[in-house]
Amino acid sequence: MTFEILRARDQPASPWKNGGGMTREIAAFPEGAGLTDFDWRVSLATVAAAGPFSTFPGVDRLMLLLGGRLTLEMAGMKPVTLDGASPPFAFPGDAPVSALAPAAPVTDVNVMVRREGFTARLERRRIAGTAAVVGQDVTLILARADGVEVALAAHADALDALDVARVDGARGALIRLRSTRAVDVVVVHVNAVRPG
């Protein structure tokens, strides 16, 4: 089992190829993998302009808006408008998806997994006081505001806004969260596909 804090200040931003936004990679597997050879990837994306999303054949995607409003268009579907209260939006990375121009830049948590090897779950949770998250193969907990304490066994640390606690190999273990005020966290679980 490993427990690691990924500080927001250490997540460099890189512009999208189409110039319509920025991405901050939080974690990827294998370590150091790029956009063509990852097995799974979690990032923060800021959408600032209209334009198509990159396609990723064989990849399942999840996105969760942290605030604002964003409308997505997919071939053969009605447009979908997401906001800061919307549940995670799942879509295949092979599908052409375009974002309409947001009124102001919006940021989302973006999760991508190679569907033949991994599954992912993404959720927003509000904590006030104490809460627990059940660990999976990989669990990432992103704080929306300062002052979220994360603990597992002998490990403990505090998260500031957009910091992430990453826990690997703690499937079934309880990861404890504590905050002295109501705050949202985003929880990402990634699991390897098991035979049978």
Task: Give the residues covered by each predicted segment.
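Jelly-roll (double-stranded beta-helix
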Residues: 1-196
